[in-house]
């Protein structure tokens, strides 16, 4: 079966799954924006994705296939990340500038979303850990599903 569009998300329309089993189809963060890919469902059946150009990135809970008994949905595998919580605006600027020079994709959370303080989230990298340790910057290594997939963006100077 070839899927060309995603029309439903179980978090937007929870009533869609009533009376049916929900089975997660696991995706890594790095493939969520790929239009064309093949995935294996439980039981060995393969499902092809051939999404239209400009289609939104796959989200947790997107319905891939459904029948009377079962709904197959996107389940995003958590990503190994560093949640960096600088102590003040000066330290935040230093960290953002230093890691930005490495062209690391980063995301940010407001106080109370992930931690009590505002945080910068980057994918785990042992060199970043060394940098943070060398500069006594507070961080926590954890796994989470980021709200937006991490993407390396090209750049020029």
Swiss-Prot record:
GO terms for cellular component: cytoplasm. SMART domains: UreE_N. GO terms for biological process: protein folding; protein-containing complex assembly; urea metabolic process. It holds the Pfam family UreE_N. Keywords: Chaperone, Cytoplasm, Nickel, Nickel insertion. It comes from the Bacteria. Its main location: cytoplasm. GO terms for molecular function: nickel cation binding; unfolded protein binding. It is found in: Cytoplasm. The keyword Cytoplasm applies. Involved in urease metallocenter assembly. Binds nickel. Probably functions as a nickel donor during metallocenter assembly. Belongs to the UreE family. This is Urease accessory protein UreE. It comes from Corynebacterium glutamicum (strain R).
């Amino acid at each position: 079966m070839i899927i060309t569009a995603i029309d439903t998300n179980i978090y937007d329309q929870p009533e869609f799954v009533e009376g049916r089993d929900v089975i997660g189809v696991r995706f890594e963060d790095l493939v969520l924006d790929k239009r064309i890919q093949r995935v294996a469902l439980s039981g060995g059946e393969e499902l092809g994705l051939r999404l239209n150009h400009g289609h939104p990135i796959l989200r947790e809970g997107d319905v891939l296939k459904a029948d009377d008994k079962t709904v197959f949905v996107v389940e995003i595998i958590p990503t190994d990340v560093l949640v960096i919580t600088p102590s003040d605006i000066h330290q935040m600027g230093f960290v953002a500038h230093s890691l930005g020079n490495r062209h690391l994709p980063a995301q940010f959370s407001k106080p109370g979303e992930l931690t009590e303080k505002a945080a910068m989230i980057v994918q785990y990298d042992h060199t970043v850990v060394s940098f943070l340790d060398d500069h006594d910057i507070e961080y926590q290594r954890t796994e989470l599903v980021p709200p937006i997939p991490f993407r390396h963006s090209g750049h020029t100077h």
